[in-house]
């Protein structure tokens, strides 16, 4: 990682500049939503609420700044760690390619990743923006440990870390799967590029490994969430308007996702 940053100082600086240009305004105002007010007035109660909806990992990170809600400080941490997450993503892509290529292509990542509209709503909430940024870092680090460090202890640590991140935000599961699939596709692409024969067994192994890693990490994260509820004696609950898979018609859930995605990507002006 140090070697990568040393060779790509311009990329690291550019990543910080893009994040600052996108969210730097948050360093100069103290606007926050009503959810943050609830946290200020009922800190313990809000942490228990997160445990009840299956987010004990988010609670664990929140304890890093326990009972301390400084809007400016949390926004600063969020921006710093989001920039670090962007650099880590560049590093992961660089490791996954394994080939000599024009390093300037890496500048595409900080140009579109931190500036994506997907994050604009999330970073409006001071309540969780620091933990969200740190969580992205942990997801990428876990996959680097699993796929790019030969030491088995690090691989095990990476697996446990990946499962832990899924107890922070369930949406990290989709993010992790996307990065894993990218790694697999790059491996297959460069094998074909070098005229290496890939058998059906090799394809099946890579896909099977992906499915096994995804399912096992998800199952372990759910066990962690259940254990946290049991230890803390907290009953399960759900967020308002949360999609309850299996308790509503599947078509209704799909339509909800389509409507939300349409509103997010194609908002009416």
Q: What does each of the following model-derived ranges do?
A:
Residues 79-99, 141-145:
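Transmembrane-helix motifs of polytopic, lipid-linked glycan transferases
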Residues 55, 104-147, 167-172, 176, ...:
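Membrane-interface micro-motifs in multi-pass membrane enzymes
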Residues 34-41, 50-90, 121, 131, ...:
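Membrane-embedded glycan transfer/ligation machinery
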Residues 25-73, 207, 211-269:
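Membrane-lumen/periplasm interface segments of multi-pass, membrane-embedded glycan/lipid transferases
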Residues 139-154, 187-194:
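Membrane-interface transmembrane helices that cradle and orient dolichyl/undecaprenyl
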Residues 176-218:
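Perimembrane helix-loop-helix junctions
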Residues 1-20:
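Start-transfer (signal-anchor) and selected internal transmembrane alpha helices
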Residues 154-176, 181:
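Membrane-interface alpha helices of multi-pass inner-membrane proteins
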